[in-house]
Amino acid sequence: MATVPTRSGSPRQLTTKQTGDAWEAQARRWLEGKGLRFIAANVNERGGEIDLIMREGRTTVFIEVRYRRSALYGGAAASVTRSKQHKLLQTARLWLARHNGSFDTVDCRFDVVAFTGNEVEWIKDAFNDHS
């Protein structure tokens, strides 16, 4: 877990949520620098969550952000399991339906932004509903 200095000068541990939020904010800024436009963050639908929803041209991009300190156990990208992919697909399906869309009517893709140590990897179209 990351640490941050406090007013007293002694560092305190960030919660897992705070650490995740910080990496998601960094991913958002990085992707905006690449030309994507922000739509929403931390979208919850029936037990699933999508970290970021952005737009690249006419494509709606659902983004999973992952961070790992090292690649010792496969790195950040490897942590997006089939089970997690299924949950992201279901959450996106529900979000699209709530916005009068579907995978059939909206051009969309699923990306992963993986931070492993100081390295960033952007995996466009990492998986889809046909995977």
Swiss-Prot record:
It holds the Pfam family UPF0102. Residues 1-19 have a biased composition (Polar residues). SUPFAM superfamilies: Restriction endonuclease-like. Disulfide bonds: none annotated. Residues 1-21 are annotated as: Disordered. It comes from the Bacteria. Gene3D superfamilies: 3.40.1350.10. One of its GO terms (molecular function) is nucleic acid binding. CDD domains: PoNe_Nuclease. Belongs to the UPF0102 family. HAMAP family: UPF0102. This is UPF0102 protein YraN.
